[in-house]
Amino acid sequence: MDTKPVFHGSDIEKICSYYNLKKENIVKFGANVNPLGLSPKAGRAIAEHVDILSSYPDREYTSLRNTISSYCNIPADFILPGNGSSELISLLIQERAPKHTLILGPTYSEYSRELSFSGSTQEYYHLQESNDFEPDIPDLCRKLEQGYDFLILCNPNNPTSSAITQEELRRLIGFCAEKNIFVMIDETYVEFAPDINAITAVPLTREFTNLMVLRGVSKFFAAPGMRLGYGITGNMDFLAKMREKQTPWSLNSLGAFAGEIMLQDEDYIKETRNLILSERDRMIRE
């Protein structure tokens, strides 16, 4: 039986070829990227400093980690920059080597893809439309008692937009800590949330060693081609082991430099949040 191919939102060339379309006639909704585009300040800085590509980046990414530290209000030692969140997902799964994984879904397919290389079983905890795709935390905990050692969730979740509050996350991660379950939380979309502090798990990395939070610049900062992601965990031993497995200089010099500019561009951050939140309200009204 013939099956249609499945495309990622970035596979524009493949889509054009398969459907015989022109690139300029495609309106992209699959990548969820900030409609404002790249920060003008970052764009100018990249153009003015492109010569840094002639030098290797700092292997420790010290300046970038310090910038992320200020941006997230977390110690720089907790931070591991990488070649997009995809590299960090892969490194985390390789190092953790889970046997039985539970994923909150529907969600981003890359988690499942990386797990398929690890030998871990994987099962979805399906969020229900009847409950506005909000997870039932007590029920989720009961499910986790069935032999799982790894939990993956995206918060806010893509594509449902549902979010788990920080207090609910604290209870969930605490339960997982008692059961020796490691938790990976993908916060790729957290900057789009109305109240970031109400749902981010980053502060919880100070409390729990069975937690890693992933973020990046692909969506909110409209820079998916930069391939800059970062992981945050208070588990220093685990972080060191991930770093040992990471390819040296996996993030290029220009990406590391531009990441610092973007994360410090408060005007762009404010403009983006104002646009997204006001447009969200307008869409709901209309």
Label every model-predicted segment.
Residues 1-55:
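N-terminal "arm"/small-domain region of PLP-dependent enzymes with the aminotransferase-like
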